[in-house]
């Protein structure tokens, strides 16, 4: 699969995951300053509303959390993590996840779009999971979202309670909003498209909902 260039660090992360035998991310076939060729992963990204609704169901949540825990554990203590706990993906969401149907069930099989990968803490990606994979928002049931967050944290093995996670979700949402705003202001086409599509307002609504219903 041909695409534009990706950051050098992301290339190193993908190569290290492959070296360690992890097969739930694309393989870098070739990369230079102008373009990158990645292996094709059979399946579909959850880019439609129907698939996104399926992606937040408990079985899918459990499996995608296991995938995140796997690569965190693989890269914990690696040189790429520097002095941080792990290497984080930093853009975990259903459209960046490849799914396949198995016996009629939708299940995640790989993570794509590693452009924002960077050294970080496990909590950073956990916050992304709990924000992007739980269906939170204006029409969401608080009880359902809390149940989904509990499943993510239990599956991951997180034992430090939910409040550090919900506070990290707020930081993650603000960071995403700031990134779009700054990038669009700097003339980046992708961030301008996101801004024009209403991403800033959407993220702010998610942030307001998180504050209102998840932060004790």
Spans of model-derived segments:
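Short, polar/flexible loop-turn hinges at active-site or ligand-entry regions and domain interfaces
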Residues: 51-54, 118-120, 136-140
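Short helix-to-loop capping/linker segments positioned immediately adjacent to catalytic or ligand/cofactor-binding
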Residues: 75-83, 137-141, 160
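Catalytic activation segment of kinase domains across protein kinase-like and atypical kinase folds
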Residues: 86, 94-129
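Active-site activation/catalytic loop segments of kinase-like enzymes and analogous catalytic loops
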Residues: 125-158, 173-183
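Eukaryotic Ser/Thr/Pro-rich intrinsically disordered, low-complexity regulatory regions
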Residues: 165-171
